[in-house]
């Protein structure tokens, strides 16, 4: 459940994961400031498609610009981090106000994407690719 700080402003928290990235998202009512690891959102994520992925829960719930987000993220690459931010924002919005649950769940934002890189097996070139086979 959402807590409130000293000034009585509602606070929400959500943890998002994708591949090997983990994002802790803190959300509160504000002007729409987004900080990732104490850096501005636009300087941390530069690719437009990753910005769209990361902010999609806010766009879907029409809350872009209504909340301040403070995100701590580590691990993985830029694509996994964008997915982890999306998952964390969705969970934080749900923690803040449960009326967003149906919209977020129907679009799959509350579900953790469990796909990870498959490990390489011995006797193979990659995880599934075999060495070239020669009959003679």
Swiss-Prot record:
Record-level Gene Ontology MF annotations: RNA binding; structural constituent of ribosome
GO cellular component assignments: cytoplasm; small ribosomal subunit
GO biological process entries: translation
Gene3D superfamilies registered for this protein in UniProt: 3.30.230.10
Xref: InterPro entries: Ribosomal_Su5_D2-typ_SF (IPR020568), Ribosomal_uS9 (IPR000754), Ribosomal_uS9_bac/plastid (IPR023035), Ribosomal_uS9_CS (IPR020574), Ribsml_uS5_D2-typ_fold_subgr (IPR014721)
This protein's UniProt keywords: Ribonucleoprotein, Ribosomal protein
Disulfides per UniProt: none
Family: Belongs to the universal ribosomal protein uS9 family.
HAMAP family linked to this entry: Ribosomal_uS9_B
Identification of the protein by name: Small ribosomal subunit protein uS9
């Amino acid at each position: 459940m959402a807590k409130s700080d000293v000034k009585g402003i509602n606070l929400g928290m959500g943890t998002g994961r994708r591949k090997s990235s983990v994002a802790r998202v803190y959300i509160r009512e504000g002007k729409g400031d987004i900080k990732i690891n104490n850096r501005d959102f636009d300087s941390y994520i530069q690719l437009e498609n990753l910005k769209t992925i990361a902010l999609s829960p806010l766009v879907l719930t029409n809350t872009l610009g209504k909340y301040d987000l403070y995100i701590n993220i580590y691990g993985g690459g830029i694509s996994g981090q964008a997915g982890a931010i999306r998952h964390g924002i969705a969970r934080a919005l749900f923690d803040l106000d449960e009326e967003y649950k149906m919209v977020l769940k129907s679009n799959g934002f509350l579900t953790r994407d469990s796909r990870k890189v498959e490990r390489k097996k011995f006797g193979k070139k990659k995880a599934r690719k075999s060495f070239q086979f020669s009959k003679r």
